[in-house]
Amino acid sequence: MIEEILTHHIIDHKLTYKLFGVIPLSSNLITLFCITIGVFILFTLIAKFRRPVLLMTAIEGLVVFIRDEIVVANFGEHGKKLTPYFCTLFIFLLFSNSLGMIPQMRTITGSISVTIGMALTSLSLIIFLGVKQNGLLGYLKHFVPEGTPWFLAPLLFFLEILGLFTKTAALALRLFANMIAGHMVIICFICLIFIMTAINKYAGIFTAIPSTGLSLFVNLLEVLVILIQTYVFTLLTAIFAGEAYAHH
């Protein structure tokens, strides 16, 4: 029983079937597909409403918040064209982080491979915007500040490149660690009930009450963590991309 709980929430299960006979499938990849299709269908249906509804009003408020507090704050007024990307990133992350709250579903951002993929997407955006705004040579120049002695230039360039990849790694690890931590704590409380029951059934009953209560409390905290980590990942991506975008 304990092994089933651990493997369901933590391990990405590989499937024998391959998409188009080439692409290997896993439970995380299928969940990613489902989230993408689900979000697309949901917002397509919402867009067809002629009259304002509560959900539409909430989404409009979210879009305005992302535009003003994340995009414009880091890119300026001319960066408003990036609002759709950051809205998509925020909503996709929100769904990905929240899915584990549903019974029998899994939080795909609790897999390091998924968070690395998302961080690499952010890295691609940072480099793309930096090169687009400043040109390839101009973008590379900002890694070595003007006035740097020639003998220090290679070292500074290496350190700046290393810093860029370090920030990307931090994005992936921060999201992964925060999303997996809550599930691990809940699993520990649940496993404690089974362990104590195996020792003595009365001890198991006595342990079940506080363990269940603490699990519910951690679940409530997880809702807050989901919102915070979704916002933090989106904001940090905007900050890093804005720094690359701003160099002239």
From Swiss-Prot:
Topological category with respect to the lipid bilayer: Multi-pass membrane protein
UniProt keyword Cytoplasm present: no
SUPFAM superfamilies listed in its UniProt record: F1F0 ATP synthase subunit A
Pfam family, one: ATP-synt_A
Alphabetized UniProt keyword annotations: ATP synthesis, Cell membrane, CF(0), Hydrogen ion transport, Ion transport, Membrane, Transmembrane, Transmembrane helix, Transport
Family statement: Belongs to the ATPase A chain family.
Protein name from the UniProt record: ATP synthase subunit a
Species annotation: Elusimicrobium minutum (strain Pei191)
Lineage of producing organism: Bacteria, Pseudomonadati, Elusimicrobiota, Elusimicrobia, Elusimicrobiales
